[in-house]
Swiss-Prot record:
Compartments, record wording: Secreted
Residue ranges of the propeptide: 1-51
Lineage: Eukaryota, Metazoa, Ecdysozoa, Arthropoda, Hexapoda
EC number: 1.10.3.-, 1.14.18.-
Glycosylation sites recorded in the entry for this protein: 64, 198, 295, 445, 507, 565
PROSITE patterns: HEMOCYANIN_2, TYROSINASE_2
Name of protein: Phenoloxidase 8
Any one cellular-component term (Gene Ontology): extracellular region
Length: 700
């Protein structure tokens, strides 16, 4: 009997193959009512059942090969078939974009349809009917959101998009070679197909120095999964999450800071905000990605192209540059006035408590934006204008560039310029807020006596970080449609950092045991020319490495914290774990939380070594406490910094990015000035060195 996880994973696997074809490497069969077949296949339904159904020779072969009967999912007929016309206008093999308002609306309605089903079994039946009639990425997105938000499916892991649509992440040449390998070579003899490290440009393009970041599979999966956990449209109980708008700000602010830090290390300058949409876009990008659903490429952008108004009737999409130019002054006026106006005329303060959260939902135009008509859709429509810069009117029947998808947008250098522009709007609001007071920053109960790091190995170097290349493998069989059964491994090379530990010595003067919060940030020192950065620049580029609760006894406490326990990251297995492991119930492979990929915890640095300031503070738990129960060592609670906690409030009442999210008081000219008055803070100088060597990741 199929488990709930197997039923739903079968619906998600091989998204372009009809559901009547066997799934799970030929071991899972769906027994469908005949009227569930699409118009193409219903006239030959009996023939298909004889060839591919639960009683077919294919099913018998499974028993002969494994000695175990195949798993059969019997789909029950529905008394009333759901009306899917709200979504069927998006063609099954066309592109799908959460930045397109009409696509987003269809996704919200489909999510609601799935959420409204009375139980998980009925959801399986309804999803089985809808699957082959709808756009494949749309179906995957809506069903995944529903699985994450239904009480009766929360034990079902959502497979990584890499395993469902690998074409959005890997060199298309690798897919051709995978199909060749699968057609000719027996499973036990197949070799991983290597994906080149640099296949989108040569070193003649300076921006290619950052391809390791922009085109990292884990980084792009993080962006996709964040938008899965925090959908902008759908039923209110799905969209309305604690501090959703602030998380939109903070997650993007942190990835921009990480990107900028590595730009400096690679000899590249500041990210220039894309503030003028009428100027030519100097950056080019040739993504080298192919949508296998229709064999159309993600279109490139040539150097110096000019953004135009978008009017594409087939996509039900109409966006004018003037729209953004009219919305933006209203947003800035609200910031400068200190309040925004809701659609019912109420003034909503943009204060230190909720201001950034309100502003985040306004800029993303989520379903809980307080006034979508007045403040518009600045963020999403910027993505749309850039995604269709090559064919704004659909004259040449070209689909969008990578800026049109949440799983691909971060590959493009222009993503960072656009988001730097958006980030500056948030910073305008943050600049209005008063600096933190001494009472807010201090902790009279503790003294942070010492801070250092050490590489986690015998005799490991102190205050020294090491990064290097790592070659890993991932099995993409669940996303390769109409291909031979068996494994489909690719190998890819990505950044990795050597494991390390933090060592803190904390003296507690309290008379009893107490709990506090340790916050750890990394701050750059120099720009690309080796010149010192101002404190303001360093504050804005402080990247969060960890935050954790600590139990302190009276007197001296020696705290050791593993880098792998970071509250920012998720482990490799949760980013890349395969569908087969999840079907088997492997808890380590459950894709239950979003988070920054662990292999990107540290910046890359360079071979000469880059110096940073490591900052730690011990803040008062009573000021942080959000009265929420969570276990930092549990699989879904361990990476909350960018993603919060599932179904619970954010675990800290402090502003995200505290204490660097606000300007400092007058007189602070350096990080040392900032730390000096506070015995609960400490700095350490650390050096990050990149080793240009490739180490294979151990495989099981």
């Amino acid at each position: 009997m199929a488990t709930l996880t197997q039923k739903f994973h079968g619906l998600l696997q091989h998204p372009l193959e009809p559901l009547f074809l066997p799934k799970n490497d030929g071991t899972l069969f769906y027994d469908l009512p005949e009227r569930f077949l699409t118009s193409r296949y219903s006239p030959i339904g009996q023939n298909l059942a004889n060839r591919f159904g639960p009683n077919s020779p294919a099913s018998s072969q499974v028993s002969n090969d494994t000695g175990v009967p195949p798993t059969v999912v019997t789909i029950k007929d529905l008394d009333e078939l759901p009306d899917l016309t709200f979504a069927t206008w998006i063609k099954r093999r066309d592109s799908f974009s959460l930045f397109n308002p009409e696509h987003r609306k269809a996704a919200g309605k489909l999510t609601k349809l799935f959420l409204d089903q009375p139980n998980a079994d009925r959801l399986v039946d309804v999803a089985a009917y809808a699957r082959d009639r709808l756009n494949a990425p749309l179906f995957q997105y809506a069903l995944s959101v529903a699985l994450l938000h239904r009480p009766d499916t929360k034990s079902v892991s959502v497979p990584s998009l890499l395993h469902l649509f690998p074409d959005q992440f890997i060199d298309p040449a690798a897919q051709v070679r995978m199909m060749e390998e699968g057609s000719i070579v027996l499973d036990e003899n197949r070799m991983p197909i290597p994906i080149p490290m640099n296949y989108t440009a040569t070193d003649a393009e300076p921006e290619q120095r950052m391809a390791f970041f922009r085109e990292d599979i884990g980084v792009n999966l993080h962006h996709w999964h964040w938008h899965l956990v925090y959908p902008a449209s759908g039923p209110p109980d799905v969209v309305r999450k604690d501090r959703r708008g602030e998380l939109f700000y903070y997650m993007h602010q942190q990835l921009l800071a990480r990107y900028q830090i590595d730009r400096y290390a690679q000899g590249l300058g500041r990210i220039e905000p894309l503030a003028n949409l009428r100027e030519p876009v100097r950056e080019a990008y040739y993504p080298k990605l192919l949508r296998t659903s229709n064999n159309r490429t993600f279109c490139p952008r040539y150097p110096g192209m000019t953004i135009s108004d978008v009017a594409r009737s087939a996509d039900r999409l109409e966006v004018r540059i003037a729209d953004i130019e009219s919305w933006l002054p209203r947003v800035l006026e609200a910031i400068d006035a200190g309040f925004a106006v809701s659609d019912d005329g109420v003034r909503v303060p943009l204060d230190e408590t909720r201001g950034i959260d309100v502003l985040g939902n306004i800029l993303e135009r989520s379903a809980i934006s307080i006034n979508r008509n007045l403040y518009g859709d600045v963020h999403n429509m910027g993505h749309v204008l850039l995604a269709f810069i090559h064919d704004p009117r659909g004259t040449y029947l070209e689909s969008s560039g990578v800026m049109g998808g949440v799983a691909t947008a971060m590959r493009d250098p222009i993503f960072y310029r656009w988001h730097k522009f958006i980030d500056n709007i948030f910073l305008r609001n943050k600049a209005r807020l008063a600096p933190y007071t001494m009472a807010e920053l201090s902790n009279s109960n503790v003294t942070l006596e010492a801070l250092e790091t050490q590489l986690d190995r015998a005799g490991g170097a102190v205050n020294s970080f090491v990064t290097f290349w790592q070659r890993s493998q991932v099995d993409l069989r669940a996303g390769i449609d109409f291909s031979a059964a068996g494994s489909a491994f690719v190998s890819f090379t990505h950044l990795q950092c050597a494991p390390f530990v933090y060592r803190l010595r904390i003296n507690s003067t309290a008379r009893s045991n107490r709990q506090d919060t340790v916050r750890i940030f990394l701050l750059p020192r120099q720009n690309e020319q080796g010149r010192p950065l101002s404190f303001e620049d360093r504050r804005l580029l402080a990247i969060e490495l960890d935050s954790f609760r600590v139990n302190l006894r009276p007197g001296m406490n020696n705290i050791v914290r593993q880098s792998s326990n970071s509250s920012v990251t998720i482990p490799f297995e949760r980013t890349f774990g395969n569908v087969e492991q999840a079907n088997a119930g492997n808890a380590q492979s459950r894709f239950c939380g979003c988070g920054w990929p662990a292999h990107m915890l540290l910046p890359k640095g360079n071979a000469n070594g880059v110096e940073f300031d490591l900052f730690a503070m011990v803040s008062r738990f009573e000021d942080d406490n959000a009265n929420v129960n969570y276990d930092e060592n549990a699989g879904c609670d361990d990476s909350y910094a960018f993603c919060g906690l599932r179904d619970r409030v954010y675990p800290s009442r402090r502003a995200m990015g505290f204490p660097f999210d606000r300007r400092a008081s007058n007189g602070v000219r350096s990080v040392a000035d900032f730390v000096a008055p506070y015995k609960n803070m400490r700095l350490a100088t650390v050096t990050l060195r990149f080793m240009n060597t490739i180490i294979d990741r151990p495989t099981n």
